[in-house]
């Protein structure tokens, strides 16, 4: 998911460079959403991993 966020970030930069501001804003918004979803999934997995690790040891 981080890969897609980076791809949309690059699309946003290229579109902004060529003056397509609406496309740039849309791609940047998608990149932000994907980044925060990936961050939330990482934190959930981290919490479960620590919790289950405590149960095992």
UniProtKB/Swiss-Prot annotation:
Localisation: Cell membrane
Keyword terms, alphabetized: Cell membrane, Membrane, Transmembrane, Transmembrane helix
InterPro entries noted in UniProt: DUF1328
GO CC annotations, alphabetized: plasma membrane
Major localisation: membrane
Membrane protein topology class: Multi-pass membrane protein
Entry-linked Pfam families: DUF1328 (PF07043)
Source superkingdom: Bacteria
Transmembrane segments: 1-21, 33-53
HAMAP family assigned: UPF0391
Similarity annotation: Belongs to the UPF0391 family.
UniProt name for this protein: UPF0391 membrane protein azo1765
Originating species: Azoarcus sp. (strain BH72)
